[in-house]
Design a protein with these regions (language model features):
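Specific aromatic-rich, kink-prone transmembrane helix
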Residues: 151-169, 307-310
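Transmembrane-helix motifs of polytopic, lipid-linked glycan transferases
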Residues: 96, 100-120, 158
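Aromatic/acidic, Gly/Pro-rich catalytic loop(s) in extracytoplasmic/lumenal soluble domains
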Residues: 436-440, 455-459, 463-499
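Short acidic/glycine- and proline-prone juxtamembrane loop motifs at membrane-interface regions
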Residues: 95, 138-152, 190
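Start-transfer (signal-anchor) and selected internal transmembrane alpha helices
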Residues: 1-41, 212-221
Length: 499
């Protein structure tokens, strides 16, 4: 036999099963409709939102200050701020274009996930995974705020898919894209990116002969270390919600799983499936399972995207495999979620009736009703083996809840979140120096920092004045105090001299 005939064929990508028959027009319509709802939720209120507490408040204040050149995303925001200011000076349109950068990064993440994860795991799994990500209650939020989280997600997702195509898929052309995405991730969140790169170093040690991990490991570690040397860890001002130096692993785990409540049955069954098949050394489960652990420890938003991929995989298996073993898990969790959703919606509406009486309550009622009704349709579809009800109900429960929140409910929240402008208007004092709030204990006050910078105040570790937050204890506020909400809870805010 000739040497050419004895040559081994290239191994197929992991779990790249044969694609199903061509999709129906109903499925195409559902996908495009879901994409429209997702995009509408991303773009709504971008130009009228008060800066969010925490990372966005610090990031926008840094872009408006004198230290914007020390951090590349802040430099980009600094260059984009005048574009929004030229549109409208009376609203928050000045922050529109920095927020649109996050929106663009989130959309690019979806694009590369569809293209590259589809090659690895099948186009249908990629589609379902992205639909589950869009239905998440928290992941789309990072496309609406002017922080580096969405940029870090783009970099980390691009790194993950491209390195799998380079090593497992034997596509040598993906090394250059891998380096580009590693640079994007390192610029946004250098410490988190370095931790992800160290995962490749571990693979070099334990799988040096199976796949070519060495070159990507050298490239990613080198880029992350270079950015750390030039830019620094950027851990002092919390320019991103996740990926900072102090640990928020439990926060990421909690909100990552809480955001998948519309997909509860699929997520629980998916995790059970990962554990079972991981013990059998099934490649998809090993890759995704290891990536979930590493991205959680690295505090990367890629963790949320991978959870969505796991849920999407179960949606495919549930209706494709006749002997799908976790059918009872999906059904039980779906029923439990439906009961809990009704109880939570009732309590939320009761609280909403007190916080936002009248029209605000009716808006919240519409949002809660959409969530519960589509969750009910999903549960009926799961028990009745109706694929359109099961998948469509689960996806639309999350998508429409997020969309209704921004369109119907958020205007009532925003009316009280705009306390920084009211505080500046009430004080009417000559701009001075403002002491930065403590990130750990007073991050709620960071919403006001960009507005004080716009008013001519100087921000620093020390200052003549500081912001103060206190609970509401009386029906009226004293002179110089304003009432408002950080997000939901009502507080009293004022400006006091530093003692």
């Amino acid at each position: 036999m000739s040497r050419k005939k004895r040559r081994k064929s290239k191994p197929p990508p992991p779990s790249a099963a044969a694609e199903p028959a061509p999709v129906s027009s109903r499925w195409r319509f559902f996908v495009w409709m879901s994409a429209f709802f997702f995009l509408a939720a991303l773009l709504t209120r971008l130009d009228v939102m008060t800066a969010w507490p925490g990372s966005e408040g610090f990031a926008l204040a840094n872009a408006l200050g004198n230290d914007w050149g020390r951090y590349l995303p802040s430099a980009l925001n600094h260059a984009l701020l005048p574009l929004g200011l030229s549109i409208d000076t009376a609203t928050d349109a000045i922050f529109l274009f920095p927020r649109l950068v996050s929106t663009l990064c989130l959309l690019l993440t979806a694009f590369f996930t569809y293209r590259w994860a589809g090659r690895l795991f099948g186009r249908r799994v990629a589609e379902l995974g992205l639909l589950c990500a869009a239905a998440s209650l928290f992941l789309p939020f990072f496309g609406k705020v002017a922080t580096a989280d969405a940029l870090a997600l783009l970099g980390h997702a691009g790194m993950f898919w491209s390195v799998l195509l380079y090593t497992v898929g034997r596509d040598r052309k993906k090394l250059l894209p891998f380096g580009i995405f590693a640079l994007l991730g390192a610029v946004a969140a250098p410490v988190s990116t370095l931790l992800l790169a160290l995962m490749l170093v571990i693979l070099v040690v334990f799988q040096r002969e199976d796949y070519p991990w060495l070159t990507p490991a050298i490239v990613s570690v080198g880029i992350a270390c270079l950015v750390l040397l030039v830019q620094g860890p950027q851990g002092a001002n919390t320019y991103w919600y996740y990926g900072q130096e102090d640990s928020r692993v439990l926060d990421l785990l909690f909100y990552g799983l809480l955001g998948t409540l519309p997909l509860a049955g699929w997520v629980v069954a998916g995790i059970r499936d990962l554990v079972f098949k991981g013990k059998q050394l099934e490649q998809f489960s090993l890759i995704i399972g290891m990536a979930l652990v590493v991205t959680l420890l690295a505090q990367s938003l890629l963790f949320m995207l991978l959870i969505a991929i796991v849920a999407g995989k179960q949606m495919q298996l549930y209706f494709r495999e006749a002997n799908y073993p976790w059918r009872d898990w999906v059904k039980s969790c779906s029923v439990l979620h439906l009961v809990l959703a009704f109880a939570v919606a009732f309590l939320a509406l009761a609280g909403g009736a007190l916080a936002f009486p009248g029209a605000g309550f009716r808006a919240a009622l519409g949002m809660a009703a959409a969530y519960w009704i589509f969750s009910l349709l999903a549960t009926l579809g799961i028990f009745g083996e109706r694929r359109d009800f099961a998948i469509g109900g689960s996806i639309l429960a999350g998508l429409l809840t997020v969309l209704f929140f921004w369109v119907q409910v958020y205007p009532y929240v925003e009316a009280e979140r705009a306390w920084p402008r009211r505080l500046l208007a009430r004080e009417s004092m000559i701009p001075s120096t403002l002491q930065l709030p403590d990130e750990a204990d007073e991050s709620e006050l960071s919403s006001a920092l960009p507005y004080f910078s716009l008013a001519g105040w100087k921000l620093g570790e020390t200052g003549n004045y500081r912001l103060r937050l206190s609970p509401v204890t009386a029906d009226s506020t004293q002179a110089g105090e304003v009432r408002g909400r950080v997000i939901l809870r009502q507080h009293v805010f004022d400006l006091v001299p530093v003692e």
